[in-house]
Each structure stands twice: as C-alpha cells, then as structure tokens.
Amino acid sequence: MMEENKRVLLGMSGGTDSSVAAMRLLEAGYEVTGVTFRFYELNDSTEYLEDARHLAERLGIRHITYDAREIFRKQIIEYFVHEYMVGHTPVPCTLCNNYLKWPLLSKIADEMGIFYIATGHYVRKVKVDDTCYITYAADSDKDQTFFLWGLKQDILRRMLLPMGDITKVEARAFAAERGFQKVAVKRDSLGVCFCPMDYRSFLKMWLVSNCQPQVSVGQPQVSAGQTWSAEVRRGRFVDEKGDFIAWHEGYPFYTVGQRRGLGIHLNRAVFVKEIRPEKNEVVLASLQALEKTEMLLKDWNIVNRERLLGHADIIVKIRYRKQENHCTVTVTLDNFLHVQLHEPLTAIASGQAAAFYKDGLLLGGGIIVE
C-alpha cells in the first residue's frame, strides 16, 4: 500500500475552482501535480489546456495532460445519445464523475506513486466509524454532492477536497488576493460540457454524423447495437388515452416533466408524462398525472447499508439543486433499490439519477428505471 504522504494529484480544468484548489493545496503544504483531462473540446478549443499549463507554471508545479477523448466518447457521449434514443433522460455528469473522472485520477495517481487525489468540487468529506462519506459543501448554491453518489471507499479515502469549506465568492477573492486576476474573473461553466446550451441541437448533429452509436459503458451497463436513422421523424403528441393532440418534432427532443418548448397551444397546461420510442409518441397530461410515490433504481451504490436501508428519515434528491423528499429505501429480490416516497414527486424520469442523504451524509444513489 502506498504511503499516505503529502503528494496529491489534482484534476485541473483551467477554471477558477481547480485553480484555486491548487493554490490551497500548496498553501496547506502538499506537493501538487496537476493533470488536465482532454475529454471533449467544444468547437476544437484547447484554451483550457493552455490556461491549466500556464497556471501550473506560475505555481511551480508539475503538469501533465491525459487524452481521454475516446473513452469519454464511448462511455459518456454515446451513452447520453443512447438514453435519449430510448426515451430516457440521462445525467451524464454523474456517470463522468463516478465512472470516469475520479477512477482515472486514481489510476494515474497509482502509476505515479501518489496516494491523494483531488479536484475543485464543492463538497466536503468526513470520516465516521472508519467509513468515509461525502457531505454538503459550505456553499449550498455550489454544492455538488449529487454528482458523486457512485464513489466507493477506495476512492473516497484518497480524496482531498480543498473547495468544500469556502464559497465561490471567497474562491474568487482568494485568487485575486494572490495576483491571479484572470483566474478570479473566469466565468462558470454551465450545463453539460459537450452540449452546454441545447441538447437537441447536439443530438441532431450527432445523429447526422454518427447514426450508429456503439455504446460501451463500463458501469452502468446499457444495451448496445441499436441502429438509428440520422433523421429523427416527427411524431404524435397524444393524451393518456392515446388520442391525437398535435405533431411533435421527434420523441428524443422531449423529456418527462417538460412544459415549455412543446410548440403547441392548448387551453390548459400540459406536461410530458411519458415517451414511447417504439411508436414515436409523446404522452401529455396534467401536472398531477405526473406524480409518483415510488421508484426503482438500477446500477446503485450504497456507502453504508445500515445507515440507508429501511430507515424512514432518508432524504432523496432526483435533480441537482431541486427539491428534497423523505423516503424509505429497500433492496428488492431482483436487486433493484425500491424507493418509497413519503410525499409524491413529479416528473420522475427513467435515466435520471437519485441520491440519498441522512444527517448531511451522502449515502449512495443509482439510476432511475421507473
């Protein structure tokens, strides 16, 4: 086993958070090596690489790059496309963090003989009875615990999280006070890195260029081999009885719970309740019709079974920065997690993630099946 020394491998994106993380780790006495992953380069821009290299040079730390574009394409982008094409609503950032980014950091650190791994995530870590847990960040507006439900102890015990105890405002001030003005004023990244604005435009572009995705996800497992036409055909909006309401642009361009952007005008508010890929139909209904009191999860991870299973005071979140609900979680005979909600939730969509908390500790999560 590697010695738990003061060496740390830090994921550096070139942005404010990971840059300030590097400064804070250095000031805490760590020997920092920065690694910048090449996951996806929007519009072929490599400015982030130069920013990370320049910062590392100013700080006097070693910096390397790691080309992960091919694995990112197969495990994240093709999964993302696959999920929309089967009528689901994926959350690619949870997959990237749990099954790609943090495991890659761990792998590279092992190869370099480094024990600790770190990022600029706004989360904290605590140890309770020899078990490590992710817990809420000091900055509730930036808290990113929701995305890390799949991490296991081999990763958790190595994590350093230098941004968890400060706010984003404090992070910007921290950089400015040390003469890193460019770092201090960098804009926050928004949305999914490979389609930060509109996923529909990305899907259209992708399907034209890559109309037969070969899905290859390590975890969670998905079925592969579907062949889709580069043309997504228009289909029918229907009510819960199956009666025609209007035409839509193609089922992948809608998500459960959606109200805006339907392109129709009715005398009542309607929401997407269900997506039927095999019929190219999108079912519309009232908001109340979208309420559910239970759900099933696959590909789940539990940090501590005794703390999570069977308790009535578990908090579940199914969206980043969205409402919380109390629930009771059990494991079914066919190895799904059954989540019994204490109050109804609306717009629970297959493919989304759910994360569980108790006493501020992230206890695990999974992917919603239904």
Curated annotation (Swiss-Prot):
One of its GO terms (cellular component) is cytoplasm. The record marks H121, Q352 as: Interaction with tRNA. Gene3D superfamilies: Adenine nucleotide alpha hydrolases-like domains, HUPs, Translation factors. It catalyses: S-sulfanyl-L-cysteinyl-[protein] + uridine(34) in tRNA + AH2 + ATP = 2-thiouridine(34) in tRNA + L-cysteinyl-[protein] + A + AMP + diphosphate + H(+). Residues 142-144, 319-320 are annotated as: Interaction with tRNA. Its main location: cytoplasm. The keyword NADP does not apply. One of its GO terms (biological process) is tRNA wobble position uridine thiolation. It holds the Pfam family tRNA_Me_trans. The active site is at C96 (nucleophile), C193 (cysteine persulfide intermediate). Keywords: ATP-binding, Cytoplasm, Disulfide bond, Nucleotide-binding, RNA-binding, Transferase, tRNA processing, tRNA-binding. Catalyzes the 2-thiolation of uridine at the wobble position (U34) of tRNA, leading to the formation of s(2)U34. Belongs to the MnmA/TRMU family. This is tRNA-specific 2-thiouridylase MnmA 2. It comes from Bacteroides thetaiotaomicron (strain ATCC 29148 / DSM 2079 / JCM 5827 / CCUG 10774 / NCTC 10582 / VPI-5482 / E50).
